[in-house]
């Protein structure tokens, strides 16, 4: 049956390939569409029939053929176009035998469930949905008033459906191509305005990873800019323990001494000679609110700077840190509609005074203008970033939390300043009401004077109170044996307050106690809610009087209709995977399947506090343990840690683990880290942050590591050699043949090997980093394992380690995790951005080990297919001895500057006119384009992209031949937005039609850039990073 089906479709497939190209160039026939569908049906039917060989009633919704773009027939065509008859012969020429793992050693994943003897090799989509629901049900959804930076929220459904669950928002990449990213950039400008307004400071970045790492970034920024070169950071005792743990980790690599104390003006005066900055929590960890104005003034008199970790919702009614003199404010936007997700992801915020605007870490959105003099947004001051500063950088921040930042901005837009203030007032009123009831029943409140949402209560036995709370369906916080804490939030209602009355043996109903208070008011009180009781009024000396969020965007879109239209308006300006492939080299922009995404909004995953007792998070622990099993299986390591919130954070974590291990064996003097010059900028930045001295290793003209230089430097620095960082396949897109030898050299000289897993999409199921010789590696779950990029985050960068390093994996001060000698925390949450781990878990379980191997094969094949097609039009910078690449390749545009006056940037901008996002631009080599198609793109889409680049090459040739001038042509004027072609004046040597419809298919389906080319220099010289406060 299958053979006859294949024969019937062979002619159709041949015709399809021809018609695909005809359709792209304008022959838009219904036949081509039908043939395309026939081709896809063949692929799916093939997969189903193959599955029938092993099952009598196989699932028909298997995931692999939906994830991998080319069908088996397409792949055979690709192989033959490259001169190979099968995958085995192709892979033999791509991957050196010395690093290949025999397939017999990678057959199937086991199970973390001891009762599951024969787990499925892979799950179908419906089977996995059932599995995910069953695992989610292992979590116990008990309402948590634990606080400590994590709170129950009401995520507006309009934001959940239209942003969080919308691929036009979550599949975008970082907005490096500003002309096709204006919607996201505007939203992030809204976010920056929100943060700057609420903190009362001049400027905010576009998000960091979380509150703890934002605190660490602030400390290091102040240290690096202290003119007196002081090295002590004074930290108030009343801060969150997780933030303190992250500060200690960051301080270690920079030689910063942290002094923990109750900060007073007198202490500041006494410590002035050696302290560069101070850190306070506002409100404090126990819930107290202090007036830090005198403290800040004293610090300023000694040229110290003040960092305040703060709560955005509290700042809607409390004096802002900027008002009382803070120089930097950090925190989390979690309270602005972001579910707890067992610890993340949440956007960390960072705002500072004007003094530090050109030193602020992370990405910064600024207003500039385009070629047509219209206002437009862009990434500003990019020379601050780690990929340029490398080992001179004091921050390695790369991936941040763009999607979560955008969601929090929409939350502020939806509620507006008045709505946010209402929410904050209700929380404060509820806390005041509860405090009054507790005190009337004889309880002592530690922070009774001033507070916002948190109370610390003295009790006879904290354990008994927590047990009783649990019986009532609530989690409270144990402070110590005789104190408990609780933090109220926007979800609190009468039922919750009544339950808290019962937990603390207050033998009254909420209504009864309310009436007692209301009738005792000086002038009586007939209010029907708690908000207007005099005991629920914030003291004037703490109450905020300055205005905030006065820009129209925060005062217009309060109905769901208006918000929905605004969200859609913004997303229509941004190109995403919903529109076209995004072939960014080293970024792995693959499919983020809906089935993978569904679990993250399940309340049983979304609404779990990270500090709940372990038995309440068994579902999450299952996901984490299963991911560890699968990741260590495919990498050849022994243990894993999920705390790092990005790939760069994973680098830093892995290197910090190496340092801890070496100190434990008396080798703490080792401080040299060898890094190839081809490495991504985060590598040297991470090494410097971990306290290493970076020594670069040369590369040869063919892109390979210079083994002679490596050996010489390893020998020269043998006594101090700590580590070698290697990316494999290399950042030039090649499987180097000598990698095992290189790693052996490092081990022979006493060093450890750090393996950068940024390019793991070429290796899964084919090579094991641990078997090659690495001691530790990080993985990018937002690349290889399908967590979406979100427009610049979230990300997850777990590290996998060999057994000898496992004892040093990061710990946490609240939740038991990590190694027995674990380093202090690298993120606020014990398991990092746990809320999105189900995405990678879903991908791996639905693909199975064999499916993951097939994905790697497809990624390699797709890259080489495209490289072959483009090689007769552009020079390829590097290939191996067989003229093949790995999963990505580099096109050389350097010659065109001399021949046509255009460069890689011009090609990138012209691609926008073809409705494509550009490849990675000018990295790892200036004036080149690095292309990575991933396994998810179809033959049709890859051919469409190749045809676009080939067409652009012809446009360049016209300049070379004098048919178009060098200073006025299709490329240097690109992109061409609608405003451009609609202008009355047209002084171009090409038609308007050719400018915007260079190929006929674009007349049917085109994504329009919303602005013309940005003026980058103007934006940096005239830095403007917030919306004007005009209503």
Swiss-Prot record:
Question: Which CDD domains does the annotation name?
Answer: GDC-P
- Name the UniProt key words of this record, in alphabetical order: Mitochondrion, Oxidoreductase, Pyridoxal phosphate, Transit peptide
**First and last residues of the transit peptide:** 1-49
Q: Quote a single Gene Ontology cellular component term.
A: mitochondrion
Stored InterPro entries: GcvP (IPR003437), GDC-P_C (IPR049316), GDC-P_N (IPR049315), GDC_P (IPR020581), PyrdxlP-dep_Trfase (IPR015424), PyrdxlP-dep_Trfase_major (IPR015421), PyrdxlP-dep_Trfase_small (IPR015422)
**EC number(s) of the enzyme?**
1.4.4.2
Keyword Mitochondrion found = yes
* Functional description taken from the UniProt entry: The glycine cleavage system catalyzes the degradation of glycine. The P protein binds the alpha-amino group of glycine through its pyridoxal phosphate cofactor; CO(2) is released and the remaining methylamine moiety is then transferred to the lipoamide cofactor of the H protein.
The record's comment on protein family reads: Belongs to the GcvP family.
Q: Which PANTHER family match?
A: GLYCINE DEHYDROGENASE (DECARBOXYLATING), MITOCHONDRIAL, GLYCINE DEHYDROGENASE, DECARBOXYLATING
Protein's name according to its UniProt entry: Putative glycine dehydrogenase (decarboxylating), mitochondrial
Lineage, highest ranks first: Eukaryota, Fungi, Dikarya, Ascomycota, Taphrinomycotina
